[in-house]
Swiss-Prot record:
Family under the similarity heading: Belongs to the bacterial ribosomal protein bL12 family.
InterPro entries associated with the record: Ribosomal_bL12, Ribosomal_bL12_C, Ribosomal_bL12_C/ClpS-like, Ribosomal_bL12_oligo, Ribosomal_bL12_oligo_N_sf
Keyword Ribosomal protein carried by entry: yes
GO molecular function list: mRNA binding; structural constituent of ribosome
GO biological process: translation
Magnesium recorded as keyword: no
Coiled coil: none
Function according to Swiss-Prot or TrEMBL: Forms part of the ribosomal stalk which helps the ribosome interact with GTP-bound translation factors. Is thus essential for accurate translation.
A GO-annotated cellular component: cytosolic large ribosomal subunit
Gene behind the chain: rplL
Official protein name in the record: Large ribosomal subunit protein bL12
Cited SUPFAM superfamilies: ClpS-like (SSF54736), Ribosomal protein L7/12, oligomerisation (N-terminal) domain (SSF48300)
HAMAP family named among the record's database cross-references: Ribosomal_bL12
Organism: Actinobacillus pleuropneumoniae serotype 5b (strain L20)
Pfam families for the chain: Ribosomal_L12, Ribosomal_L12_N
Length: 122
Protein backbone atom coordinates (compact mmCIF):
# COMPACT_ATOMS: atom_id res chain seq x y z
CA UNK A 1 0.00 0.00 0.00
CA UNK A 2 1.47 3.34 -1.06
CA UNK A 3 0.44 6.56 0.65
CA UNK A 4 0.22 9.88 -1.13
CA UNK A 5 2.03 12.85 0.38
CA UNK A 6 -1.27 14.29 1.56
CA UNK A 7 -2.27 11.03 3.27
CA UNK A 8 1.13 10.88 4.94
CA UNK A 9 0.80 14.46 6.20
CA UNK A 10 -2.69 13.74 7.55
CA UNK A 11 -1.42 10.61 9.32
CA UNK A 12 1.41 12.58 10.96
CA UNK A 13 -0.94 15.43 11.90
CA UNK A 14 -3.21 13.01 13.76
CA UNK A 15 -0.33 11.79 15.97
CA UNK A 16 0.49 13.16 19.42
CA UNK A 17 3.70 15.11 20.05
CA UNK A 18 5.36 12.17 21.80
CA UNK A 19 4.48 9.87 18.88
CA UNK A 20 5.98 12.39 16.43
CA UNK A 21 9.16 12.57 18.52
CA UNK A 22 9.41 8.76 18.40
CA UNK A 23 8.81 8.84 14.63
CA UNK A 24 11.57 11.41 14.14
CA UNK A 25 13.98 9.36 16.27
CA UNK A 26 13.19 6.23 14.24
CA UNK A 27 13.72 8.12 10.96
CA UNK A 28 17.03 9.56 12.20
CA UNK A 29 18.21 6.06 13.10
CA UNK A 30 16.99 4.48 9.85
CA UNK A 31 18.52 7.11 7.56
CA UNK A 32 21.56 8.02 9.67
CA UNK A 33 20.73 11.73 9.88
CA UNK A 34 19.94 14.22 12.60
CA UNK A 35 16.86 16.41 12.22
CA UNK A 36 18.09 18.80 14.92
CA UNK A 37 21.35 19.48 13.08
CA UNK A 38 19.56 20.20 9.83
CA UNK A 39 16.98 22.51 11.38
CA UNK A 40 19.19 24.43 13.78
CA UNK A 41 22.59 24.22 12.07
CA UNK A 42 22.71 27.75 10.66
CA UNK A 43 21.52 29.69 13.76
CA UNK A 44 23.54 27.54 16.15
CA UNK A 45 26.69 27.84 14.07
CA UNK A 46 26.32 31.61 13.87
CA UNK A 47 25.75 31.94 17.61
CA UNK A 48 28.66 29.66 18.44
CA UNK A 49 30.98 31.56 16.12
CA UNK A 50 29.97 34.88 17.69
CA UNK A 51 30.57 33.56 21.22
CA UNK A 52 33.89 31.89 20.45
CA UNK A 53 35.37 34.61 18.27
CA UNK A 54 38.76 35.66 19.60
CA UNK A 55 40.19 37.47 16.59
CA UNK A 56 38.67 40.63 15.18
CA UNK A 57 39.21 42.78 12.10
CA UNK A 58 39.09 46.57 12.29
CA UNK A 59 37.59 48.07 9.14
CA UNK A 60 37.79 51.77 8.28
CA UNK A 61 34.32 52.43 6.81
CA UNK A 62 34.72 56.18 6.17
CA UNK A 63 37.40 58.78 6.80
CA UNK A 64 34.89 61.42 7.87
CA UNK A 65 35.35 65.17 7.69
CA UNK A 66 38.75 65.41 9.42
CA UNK A 67 40.79 63.25 7.03
CA UNK A 68 44.16 64.60 8.27
CA UNK A 69 43.47 63.51 11.86
CA UNK A 70 42.32 60.09 10.64
CA UNK A 71 45.49 59.67 8.56
CA UNK A 72 47.58 60.51 11.65
CA UNK A 73 45.62 58.00 13.73
CA UNK A 74 46.03 55.31 11.06
CA UNK A 75 49.77 55.98 10.87
CA UNK A 76 50.09 55.68 14.63
CA UNK A 77 48.05 52.49 14.80
CA UNK A 78 49.54 50.66 11.82
CA UNK A 79 53.07 52.02 11.55
CA UNK A 80 52.52 52.87 7.88
CA UNK A 81 54.25 55.75 6.17
CA UNK A 82 52.38 58.96 5.32
CA UNK A 83 51.63 58.00 1.71
CA UNK A 84 50.53 54.45 2.61
CA UNK A 85 48.29 55.71 5.43
CA UNK A 86 46.78 58.37 3.13
CA UNK A 87 46.13 55.78 0.40
CA UNK A 88 44.53 53.44 2.94
CA UNK A 89 42.25 56.17 4.31
CA UNK A 90 41.23 57.27 0.81
CA UNK A 91 40.45 53.69 -0.23
CA UNK A 92 37.89 53.25 2.59
CA UNK A 93 36.23 50.91 3.30
CA UNK A 94 39.49 49.11 4.01
CA UNK A 95 40.85 46.71 6.62
CA UNK A 96 43.24 48.44 9.02
CA UNK A 97 44.19 45.49 11.21
CA UNK A 98 43.12 41.87 11.05
CA UNK A 99 43.19 39.08 13.61
CA UNK A 100 43.62 41.24 16.71
CA UNK A 101 42.13 40.80 20.18
CA UNK A 102 38.82 42.39 21.14
CA UNK A 103 40.32 44.92 23.61
CA UNK A 104 42.90 45.98 21.02
CA UNK A 105 40.21 46.27 18.33
CA UNK A 106 37.96 48.36 20.59
CA UNK A 107 40.84 50.65 21.58
CA UNK A 108 41.74 51.18 17.92
CA UNK A 109 38.11 51.84 17.03
CA UNK A 110 37.82 54.42 19.82
CA UNK A 111 41.03 56.16 18.74
CA UNK A 112 39.92 56.37 15.10
CA UNK A 113 36.40 57.51 15.97
CA UNK A 114 37.84 60.29 18.13
CA UNK A 115 39.77 61.40 15.04
CA UNK A 116 36.49 61.51 13.08
CA UNK A 117 36.49 58.18 11.24
CA UNK A 118 33.66 55.67 11.01
CA UNK A 119 34.99 52.26 12.03
CA UNK A 120 33.55 48.73 12.13
CA UNK A 121 34.77 45.70 14.04
CA UNK A 122 34.12 42.36 12.39
Amino acid sequence: MSLTNEQLIEAIASKSVSEIVELIAAMEEKFGVSAAAAVAAAPAAGAAAAEEKTEFDVILAEAGANKVAVIKAVRGATGLGLKEAKDLVESAPAALKEGISKPEAEALKKELEEAGAKVEIK
